[in-house]
């Protein structure tokens, strides 16, 4: 196993799913998981890594079901964006309690709650070792938080998007349904598309590919996995050119 004395990334974009925050409850935010994630992010900051974070909102709101029931998709997506802001507030609070300087930015203006998203301000904060939480997706309906992660990753000039999931990486098939599924250590963007592997939605994935932004998929539920990823150890699946 390769072990580096120094991190292999200087600036990362960490994509957390909303579901990752809910733990075994099935809904809402599990405070113990939130605090563990804050501690893992703190470790990265102490290593000198600049950290941007995008969080989904699926633990608080899922628009798909309501869309089927007749709700306007734009309204549902706006509600989903607000759910990501709520998760961002919780993460900012957890980081502050862990004595980590963190700033929450939103793609839709919410004066008095958090800062408006500014690309230049985000980069300035990162350079000053502040964790920047980027909420409300892209600010537009019809785009996922994976798209937001890739877009913000490109904007802040991140070295990589680290997509935290509930599985160890990208597999040949769904490991929950197929016990013979094996995990890929590395893939190219083309291989992911050819094999129709579920990494991200197509809009997000092609955005990353077109801008040569590497993606690493790993299991955030595995203690220490995030640190191992940034130290260049064998963890998860790396997707590059």
Curated annotation (Swiss-Prot):
Where in the cell?
A: Cytoplasm
Sites where the protein binds UMP: 57, 77, 138-145
Give the UniProt keywords, A-Z. Allosteric enzyme, ATP-binding, Cytoplasm, Kinase, Nucleotide-binding, Pyrimidine biosynthesis, Transferase
Question: Which InterPro entries does the protein's record reference?
Answer: AceGlu_kinase-like_sf, Asp/Glu/Uridylate_kinase, Uridylate_kinase, Uridylate_kinase_bac
Q: Which superkingdom is the protein from?
A: Bacteria
Q: What is its main location?
A: cytoplasm
Q: Where is this region: Involved in allosteric activation by GTP?
A: 23-28
The residues that hold ATP are 15-18, 58, 62, 165, 171, 174
Q: Which residues form a coiled coil?
A: none
Its EC number(s):
2.7.4.22
Q: Write down the Pfam families for this protein, in alphabetical order.
A: AA_kinase (PF00696)
Task: Enumerate the transmembrane spans.
Answer: none
- What reactions does this protein catalyze? UMP + ATP = UDP + ADP
Task: Please report which protein family the annotation says this sequence is part of.
Answer: Belongs to the UMP kinase family.
Q: Which HAMAP family does this UniProt record tie to the protein?
A: PyrH_B
Briefly state the protein's biological role.
Answer: Catalyzes the reversible phosphorylation of UMP to UDP.
From the Swiss-Prot or TrEMBL record, give the protein name. Uridylate kinase
- Organism of origin is Klebsiella pneumoniae subsp. pneumoniae (strain ATCC 700721 / MGH 78578)
What lineage, starting at the top, does this entry show? Bacteria, Pseudomonadati, Pseudomonadota, Gammaproteobacteria, Enterobacterales
Identify the coding gene.
pyrH
């Amino acid at each position: 196993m390769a072990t580096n004395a120094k991190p292999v990334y200087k600036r990362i974009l960490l994509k957390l799913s909303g579901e990752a925050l809910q733990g075994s409850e099935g809904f809402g935010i599990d405070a113990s998981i939130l605090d563990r994630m804050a501690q893992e992010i703190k470790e990265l900051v102490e290593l000198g890594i600049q950290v941007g974070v995008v969080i989904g909102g699926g633990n608080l709101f899922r628009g798909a079901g309501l869309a089927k029931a007749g709700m306007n998709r734009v309204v549902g997506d706006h509600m989903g964006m607000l759910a990501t802001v709520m998760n961002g507030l919780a993460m900012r609070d957890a980081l502050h309690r862990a004595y980590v300087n963190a700033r929450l930015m939103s793609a839709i203006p919410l004066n008095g709650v958090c800062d408006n998203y500014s690309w230049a301000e985000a980069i300035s904060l990162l350079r000053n070792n502040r964790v920047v939480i980027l909420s409300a997706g892209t600010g537009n309906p019809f785009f996922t938080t994976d798209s937001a992660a890739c877009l913000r990753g490109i904007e802040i000039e991140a070295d990589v998007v680290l997509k935290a999931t509930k599985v160890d990486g990208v597999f040949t098939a769904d490991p929950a349904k197929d016990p013979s599924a094996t995990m890929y250590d590395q893939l190219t963007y083309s291989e992911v598309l050819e094999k129709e592997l579920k990494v991200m939605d197509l809009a997000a994935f092609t955005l990353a590919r077109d801008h040569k932004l590497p993606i690493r998929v790993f299991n955030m539920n595995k203690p220490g996995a995030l640190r191992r990823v940034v130290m260049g150890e064998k963890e998860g699946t790396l997707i590059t050119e």
